[in-house]
């Protein structure tokens, strides 16, 4: 099913039984941490990621430089390069850290779960830094297979894990039947993710239309239309 809203990534223990992408990825064995090396400073990492999004919003992809990010974050360039060897890796992680604010929380019904995550996802997409970064990544990723792979690993896959957890919540509540075939279930999870994320991104980033509470209700009703028993 669908992911729902989650607390900022710097809070290690999300409230209300929520599950973050980092925790969800760990639960299914997906890689999230980088390799070995000098101990990381969480404060420095956050400052760098914040500075990256700020620079993207102001300068765009073409104007962003590693030196400018280091200066904005108040760290040495060597510190920045030790953590992120390339601009593309840095930008992907800066955006991934925003979407790490989504949380899979059981709100009592599949419809409520979907409505909550769509609302929070839309909020994140309306941020100027998010829009600038995503549009740049989409453009660059179309020309760079390695960047496209990193986008899939750091941004897309963690959110698909949350879709999987939301689906499991619905099954535990008896709203959905248990999965019978893992391959089919995985394919369905991908379709659900693409439908929700793609629709919201297209409406906000391409059409420039707002995502209102009424629109979210109508979208969710349409999404669950083939399953009337899931509608409140």
Residue ranges and their predicted role:
Residues 1-32, 164-168, 172, 202-232:
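C-terminal peripheral helix-coil segments that are non-catalytic and often amphipathic
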Residues 1-72, 89:
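Basic, helix-initiating cap at the start of DNA-binding domains
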Residues 48, 63, 86-91, 101-102, ...:
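Short amphipathic alpha-helical segment with a characteristic S/N-K-E followed by hydrophobic residues
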Residues 74-84:
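Short hydrophobic/aromatic patch on the recognition helix
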Residues 83-84, 151, 155, 201-202:
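Tryptophan-centric aromatic hotspots in well-structured domains and transmembrane helices
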Residues 89, 94-95, 126-153:
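Amphipathic alpha-helical segments used for helix-helix packing
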Residues 102-131, 185:
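Hydrophobic alpha-helical connector segments
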Residues 132, 145-173:
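Amphipathic alpha-helical packing segments from all-alpha helical-bundle domains
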């Amino acid at each position: 099913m669908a992911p729902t809203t989650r607390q900022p990534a710097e809070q290690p223990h999300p409230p209300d039984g929520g599950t973050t992408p980092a925790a969800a990825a760990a639960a299914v064995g997906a890689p999230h941490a980088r390799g070995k090396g000098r101990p990381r400073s969480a404060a420095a990492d956050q400052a760098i990621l914040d500075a990256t999004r700020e620079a993207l919003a102001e300068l765009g992809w073409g104007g962003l430089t590693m030196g400018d990010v280091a200066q904005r974050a108040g760290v040495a360039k060597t510190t920045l390069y030790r953590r992120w060897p390339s601009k593309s890796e840095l930008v992907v992680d800066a955006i991934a850290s925003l979407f790490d604010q989504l949380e899979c929380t059981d709100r009592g019904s599949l419809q409520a779960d979907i409505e909550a995550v769509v609302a929070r996802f839309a909020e994140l997409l309306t941020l100027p830094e998010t829009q600038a970064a995503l549009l740049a990544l989409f453009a660059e990723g179309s020309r760079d297979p390695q960047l496209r792979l990193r986008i899939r690993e750091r941004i897309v896959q963690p959110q698909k894990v949350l879709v999987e957890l939301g689906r499991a919540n619905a099954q535990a509540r008896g709203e959905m039947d248990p999965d019978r075939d893992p391959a089919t279930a995985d394919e369905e999870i991908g379709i659900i993710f693409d439908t929700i994320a793609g629709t919201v991104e297209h409406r906000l980033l391409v059409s420039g239309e707002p995502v209102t509470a009424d629109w979210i209700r109508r979208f969710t009703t349409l999404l669950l239309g083939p399953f009337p028993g899931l509608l409140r």
